[in-house]
A protein has these predicted regions:
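Exposed extracellular interaction/assembly regions and N-terminal maturation sites
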Residues: 8, 18-106, 116, 120, ...
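Sec-dependent, cleavable N-terminal signal peptides
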Residues: 1-3
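Short, solvent-exposed loop/linker segments at beta-strand-coil boundaries, enriched for Pro/Gly
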Residues: 108-111
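Residues that line or immediately flank small-molecule/substrate-binding pockets and catalytic motifs
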Residues: 15
């Protein structure tokens, strides 16, 4: 019989000015802290806001692949109580059977910088920062962290 183990993260909120919660995420000051789940992705795909926010994209491409992030409008709409400066991390895990590379591309309204490719058997971390939440002008920046 298997036993489930629950892990809880303790947060010291004494020096925080604003904490917001809903069923899917916690926002502390402007940083989104969400439940982490894995999303299986194979070849070239457009990633949804929900998949991105929950944190881990497990890639098993059978050729070179591009994972396009959601548009800024969809991403802003997908973050509860979003504000300029809201941010979160996500990871791309390239579990390809051969030497196929995954490239992360910003969606419409997004800007990307840093290393955006993930080689076979590599896990790369990315940081997303919301830079505009105004309707029809939504924007974000995504950094590929080396």
């Amino acid at each position: 019989m298997s036993q489930q183990v629950k892990v809880y993260r303790q947060l010291d909120l004494r020096d925080k000015t604003r904490v917001t919660t809903n069923k899917d995420m916690i926002i502390i000051d402007d940083e989104v802290v969400s439940k982490r789940t894995q999303t299986a992705v194979t070849n070239t795909a457009t990633i949804t806001a929900a998949q991105l926010i929950t944190g881990i994209l497990d890639g098993t491409p059978t050729a070179g692949a591009t994972y396009t992030l959601p548009t800024a409008a969809l991403l802003v709409a997908g973050i509860y109580n979003v504000q300029v400066g809201s941010s979160f991390f996500f990871a791309v895990n390239n579990k390809a059977g051969d030497a196929y590379t995954i490239t992360v591309a910003a969606g419409n309204g997004g800007t990307a910088d840093g290393t955006l490719t993930v080689a076979q058997n590599v896990i790369r971390l990315f940081l997303v920062i919301i830079t505009n939440v105004t309707s029809s002008s939504e924007a974000y920046f995504v950094y590929g962290i080396e």
